[in-house]
UniProtKB/Swiss-Prot annotation:
UniProt name for this protein: Acyl-CoA thioester hydrolase YciA
Function as written in the Swiss-Prot or TrEMBL entry: Catalyzes the hydrolysis of the thioester bond in palmitoyl-CoA and malonyl-CoA.
PANTHER family documented for this protein: ACYL COENZYME A THIOESTER HYDROLASE (PTHR11049), ACYL-COA THIOESTER HYDROLASE YCIA (PTHR11049:SF5)
Record key words, sorted: Hydrolase
Length: 133
């Protein structure tokens, strides 16, 4: 799962700007904020696959590879790596495009993790995923 490829794996599901309010005590973007963006991006893909509501049930292998600077563009790429009866496993990579710090234009993978979502009905109970077709 953790590779230093130079090409993002998956589809772009979320793109946002790293802001000063999202920094940690060292001035880098807080890891929890990155994880939140990953969960949002992964949920978008999971909802498309499930045709409806999903909940996050687990995160595996969260790996922070490089820090993120304020003002840089944060891009979440997601790909489904496994489908169960009710669950969807999505690998999410965060790639950064440096637009506010040197070297301008550089792209790199900042973090990666596996997020597991479960499709749920209106009562919050697991429901089967639709048949792939």
């Amino acid at each position: 799962m953790t590779t230093m490829d130079n090409t993002p794996q998956g589809e772009l599901v979320l793109r946002t700007l790293a802001m000063p309010a999202d920094t940690n005590a060292n001035g880098d973007i807080f890891g929890g904020w990155l994880m939140s963006q990953m969960d949002i991006g992964g949920a978008i893909l999971a909802k498309e696959i499930a045709h409806g509501r999903v909940v996050t049930v687990r995160v595996e292998g969260m790996t922070f590879l490089r820090p993120v600077a304020v003002g840089d563009v944060v891009c979440c790429y997601a790909r489904c790596v496994k489908r169960g009866t009710t669950s969807i496993s999505i690998n999410i990579e965060v790639w950064v495009k440096k637009v506010a710090s040197e070297p301008i234009g550089q792209r790199y993978k900042a973090t990666e993790a596996l997020f597991i979502y479960v499709a749920v009905d209106p009562d919050g109970k697991p429901r089967p995923l639709p048949v792939q077709g």
